[in-house]
Amino acid sequence: MAYHSFLVEPISCHAWNKDRTQIAICPNNHEVHIYEKSGAKWNKVHELKEHNGQVTGIDWAPESNRIVTCGTDRNAYVWTLKGRTWKPTLVILRINRAARCVRWAPNENKFAVGSGSRVISICYFEQENDWWVCKHIKKPIRSTVLSLDWHPNNVLLAAGSCDFKCRIFSAYIKEVEERPAPTPWGSKMPFGELMFESSSSCGWVHGVCFSAGGSRVAWVSHDSTVCLVDAEKKMAVATLASETLPLLAITFITENSLVAAGHDCFPVLFTYDNAAGTLSFGGRLDVPKQNSQRGLTARERFQNLDKKASSEGGAATGAGLDSLHKNSVSQISVLSGGKAKCSQFCTTGMDGGMSIWDVKSLESALKDLKIR
């Protein structure tokens, strides 16, 4: 495990470049800062300033090296590196509420933006007019879209929203792609077609994720439940009520293992039993260390006042919090190995810190941990 504290401000979202040498983060304001690794240090190399509202989503396309951002100003920008400068292109989303999340499609020929306008904007580039245009997926979304994830086929899109539902839509754009092949989710996929809708969640759906194979979708809700639907099992949904505080992010690290994190400030493992069709709690991945009793320096005390709004010595030192992150984990991303066989993943949190977790090291450190 490697932990780096970038700043006192919370990290509201992040994205990595292709070779994992640079990370783009939002320091909880209208800017995006890009840091580059140099030895053991992270140096700020770029600042992207175009939004006039808080940035709520960042995604970095690995092949085209383009960054897409969205924010509470109801806009999205596609950033292209020209020389040593990132140049923004405005994308009109045609929404009247804040944009909340953004994700590039796997083929990088379109991206999706979820918003408070109860729509998902599917944006693609029109060569004839030399600009980005968007189509809206509207029905039957009844509240803010908080999370998105693409199916590997570049067409299906999973969305979690504040109406307590996880849904899968077709985001097929005939202008930029060929007709998709049938999937376990269905064979007819016109734009906006609802392929699946959950009925088991009882809270805002904070995070959603497709498996590497694309036949499973997992999501986490504000009622502290984790759910997984398997299209190859007649859309059977497995639900587990966890004992943690609400989870905010989730990702597959193998076809049967998932990592999630949220307000408890540490990542946890969940395992799916394919034969039984059930989810189980696999354990906490952040091993608590015995804290040595020591006094706080003035600098540490003021930093912790900012991070945790706490002046109590125990809470400030982390005696009350024995996790690596000292505040809620807001995002998880797979660093290497992909969702099929992840070897490293990254978490960023409201404490302004970023952690890199090595799966093999976690398995050896935690004797009872079995990642299948």
Curated annotation (Swiss-Prot):
GO terms for cellular component: Arp2/3 protein complex; cytoplasm; nucleus; tubulobulbar complex. Component of the Arp2/3 complex composed of ACTR2/ARP2, ACTR3/ARP3, ARPC1B/p41-ARC, ARPC2/p34-ARC, ARPC3/p21-ARC, ARPC4/p20-ARC and ARPC5/p16-ARC. GO terms for molecular function: actin filament binding; protein-containing complex binding; structural constituent of cytoskeleton. Component of the Arp2/3 complex, a multiprotein complex that mediates actin polymerization upon stimulation by nucleation-promoting factor (NPF). The Arp2/3 complex mediates the formation of branched actin networks in the cytoplasm, providing the force for cell motility. In addition to its role in the cytoplasmic cytoskeleton, the Arp2/3 complex also promotes actin polymerization in the nucleus, thereby regulating gene transcription and repair of damaged DNA. PANTHER family: ACTIN-RELATED PROTEIN 2/3 COMPLEX SUBUNIT 1 (PTHR10709), ACTIN-RELATED PROTEIN 2_3 COMPLEX SUBUNIT 1B (PTHR10709:SF10). This is Actin-related protein 2/3 complex subunit 1B. It is found in: Cytoplasm, Cytoskeleton; Nucleus. Keywords: Actin-binding, Cytoplasm, Cytoskeleton, Nucleus, Repeat, WD repeat. Gene3D superfamilies: YVTN repeat-like/Quinoprotein amine dehydrogenase. GO terms for biological process: Arp2/3 complex-mediated actin nucleation; response to estradiol; response to estrogen. WD repeats lie at residues 6-45, 50-89, 94-135, 140-179, 242-280, 324-367. Belongs to the WD repeat ARPC1 family. Its main location: cytoplasm. It comes from the Eukaryota. Transmembrane segments: none annotated.
